[in-house]
A protein has these predicted regions:
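Hydrophobic/aromatic beta-strand patches that form the interior of the parallel beta-sheet core
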Residues: 76, 101, 125, 149-151, ...
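Glycine-rich phosphate/pyrophosphate-binding loop at beta-loop-alpha junctions
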Residues: 159-219
């Protein structure tokens, strides 16, 4: 079965509509990425950045600043069947002595990524849904009810963007700024943040999970 995505022709980056690169760098001022280093290797003429070797995923480093500032004890997020965010949050709540509740779409068999979240101690709530926005509402309503902190889908939060820009520059080091960057695009947090970190690079995105709206794909 072939799937088609609706992708906007708008090339704006919603993170830069009212804020600048300097704003995000200032927001993360003093924060240092202490997560395990990614593998940044040359492969067939390309430079590959691999965060999977850390066991955290990219959001495991980018989400650190946000979770470090969360006052609530319980963190609430929506974990799809495939995705590293729940695993990343599992590590971060352990680091900052918090609890994690994950709302997951129910199916006949739990996915590998969801299972890892369970193994890492996340409290799970499975719901049968027609679309992810419905599950997001369940999760947000639950967070409001228990006084927890609801993390937007994809960790779409300015502190995550700020840490993402700072972390990328810290880990990239003194390498020349890349001319071309190829990235998957789901919520677009990764791609939009990298565009801020590397303002002169040309970006090529591969949509993998959802329709993309104005402001989400950037340049």
């Amino acid at each position: 079965m072939a799937f088609e995505f609706e992708i906007t022709s708008d090339t704006s980056n919603k993170y830069l509509k009212e804020k600048t690169r300097d704003y995000y760098l200032e927001l993360a001022s003093g924060w240092v990425d202490t997560a395990p280093k990614p593998a940044i290797v040359d492969l067939n003429g390309a430079t590959v950045w691999d965060d999977s070797v850390t066991g955290l995923g990219t959001k495991g480093r980018w989400g650190d600043l946000l979770i470090s500032k969360v006052e609530q004890k319980e963190v609430v997020y929506v974990q799809p069947r495939v995705g590293w965010a729940g695993m990343s949050l599992s590590a971060l709540v352990d680091k900052y002595d918090k609890n994690l509740t994950l709302f997951m779409p129910a199916s006949k068999k739990i996915s590998d990524h969801q299972l890892i979240c369970v193994e890492r101690g996340a409290k799970t709530k499975f719901r049968r849904i027609a679309a992810m926005p419905v599950l997001n509402k369940y999760a947000k309503d639950y967070a409001d009810e228990v006084g927890g902190f609801f993390v937007p889908f994809g960790l779409d939060h300015e502190l995550v963007v700020a840490a993402g820009v700072a972390s990328t520059l810290q880990q990239w080091g003194d390498r020349p700024e890349p001319k071309h960057i190829v990235s998957v695009v789901s919520t677009g947090v990764l791609c939009r943040t990298l565009q801020i970190a590397f303002p002169n690079a040309e970006f090529h995105g591969v949509a993998v999970a959802r329709n993309l709206k104005a402001g989400e794909i950037g340049r």
